Amino acid sequence: MICRILILLTIIVSSCIKIPKDSYVSELKVPFKFDWKTIEAQTVKIVELSNVINGKGDTIATLLPPGDYSLTVVKNSTLSVVKSISAPATKAIGGSIKEAVYFPSKGRYATVMFEDLFPSKGDMDMNDAVFGLNIEFFVDNTAKVRAFRINIQPRAIGSSYPSIGLAASIYTFPGVSFVEKISHSSNSYVNDLFRVNAAGGEYSVEQGNLFDVIPITGNFRAYFNNSKDLFLNVRNIDPFTSTQEFYVDVELKSNAKFPFSSLTLLEPAATGKVNIDIFGVFGGRGKEVHFKDGRPTNYFYYPYFVSTNTSNFATVDNWVWAVLSDQSIRHPQEFKKIYHAYPNFKSWAESGGGGGAGWYAPAVLDSLWTSGNFSYVN
């Protein structure tokens, strides 16, 4: 009898409790394993001093000595090796002739777009920090990386955070300290966001990390010629704000040079590989925004991962806060979702990268920022 009463009470109480429905709707049906990459590594074997060009005629590498090279290029690129008739290059970083590998190619910028609302999914306009990225890797005559230059073309800020930082990191397993010194082309004050030792126009990697973190900026806003507005180059109703391009030179320790074949870019950490990551910092040092599978630094605020129920800088339905195009493309206007501005972005993501890397065509110009031009392909 008591058992029947308890069962009856349980039924009555249960009928009074309303379990909230999960109202979350995934905007895109993205395969869980999709890495959001438009780039890949292609292995090239050089047997004599050579240049490398892609199918468009863009220069990927110049004056490479014999060796194996893992070149980061747009997916499905066709690469050609052309014998060089020039003399071997000088070894000084900044010299006019260099043995160099370029990303995405010589004299051209890829486009990096960050969303600042991590760990929330955000408004998906991907314009909170936008910049052109070009990296030059300098090698010695044994095909080892000895230095690299990170070229930045600031383009837009759609973030309300007054302080935004950019940084790179270089790491491998087991941990190794690679960097000898860093120098900046401008008088940027980097240690308002990053803890560095600075002297004589050079500065150190950020102190207190398990691997080398290379500050690229102090406040990213300092490179925009407009100190009064928060939103810069993200609304067509606003006047164009010009920006200052700059670069950061990174020289490696003589005993830490590594074979170019070991280099990866924006890839997960892996034994035997040396990866270079690019990430953003929004508001405070702990709020880092990385590409999917990026490695957080010691200053990252790890409770953010509790909010996302993931630890790889992607949501449970595999949305991300960092996107890269290998081309110089226009970014969405404020509050315009990237997959509305670029209709093929949706099919590209939902197919797990199918159809190649050209999701930026066609474009809906009404949804894109068009009040200025940073040598866009569209």
Tell where the protein language model's regions lie, with residue ranges.
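Bacterial Sec-dependent N-terminal signal peptides
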Residues: 13-34
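Structural beta-strand segments of beta-rich domains
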Residues: 40-42, 146-150, 246
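Short Pro-Gly-centered beta-turn/loop motif in secreted/extracellular proteins
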Residues: 64-98
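Sec-dependent signal peptide recognition
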Residues: 1-8
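Short, well-ordered beta-strand segments enriched in hydrophobic/aromatic residues
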Residues: 133, 145-156
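Short, ordered, surface-exposed loop/turn motifs in non-cytosolic proteins
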Residues: 39-64, 126, 162-164
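A eukaryote-biased signal for long
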Residues: 208-378
